[in-house]
Amino acid sequence: GPAPYQYQLVEDRGVERVAALGLESWPDLKFARYEIRMDGIDKPVAVAQVARRGAGAPIVLDWDNRTGEPLLFADMRLAELKSLSQAIAKHTSNDALLLGWWDTSRALQLLTGRETLFNAHLGEPFIAPPPWQRHRRSIVRYERDFWGAPPAEVEVRRFQRFAEALSLGAAAGAAQLRELAGDREAYVVVHVSDLYKLGLLHRERLGVAYKDFPVRGDLHGPISFVKRWMGDHHYAAYAVHELSDSQARAYFLADARSGNTLLAQMLPLSTSRPAELQAQQLVH
């Protein structure tokens, strides 16, 4: 059967709207906004800002999930990608290689022109609420049709190696990433939401949970909530990501072993010190 949702084009972005989003630096890109719609629900379940270059495949730059359930993509924020693109332009040479999760990689390749290890829409892990799990085959097919050609087998295998590297201890994981990058000048780009995605792929090495908290003013109020929640559930560490002015998402690690993974060591978790990581050097 069909997928339980559809992408509906709401708006092709004209020059004025592009200016409002602060995207004038990319005059060669075409921007559009899509709503993700389900039958019987009058509001969109998610909203995506999408860009493409010429006749290229569409690429997500912003994913705003309007439900409490994980849905297709982890939340992405255009503002974060823009500031990251500026940092990459400032700190890396034009022929540097970027290693990051496939969705981040595609967006950064589009915005920075740097080569990335992954260019295809890999769709891993499969992110869907429980009622959608039985539609997995039709969802995967619909996603492939919408986002472009299926990936080559070599890229799928390379991504599996990349995800595995992030789930290993810091030294072994960094060595595996170096092997993937070859002799190139290479930079690893990670986001706190990668914890959730990697946890779905490697549950045996990385136990992850998350909870959304309301924010009023600064993050100090929610942090005390988060610490209490962590203690009540016996989690080992946390990181907080601001989704909007009114909402923050706390990611929790289930145990100390999860905190020893390369990914956890590279992120600003309550138990990590990325600046002191011996296996890699923090740039931004």
Please give the residue ranges for each predicted region.
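Extracytoplasmic
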Residues: 1-284
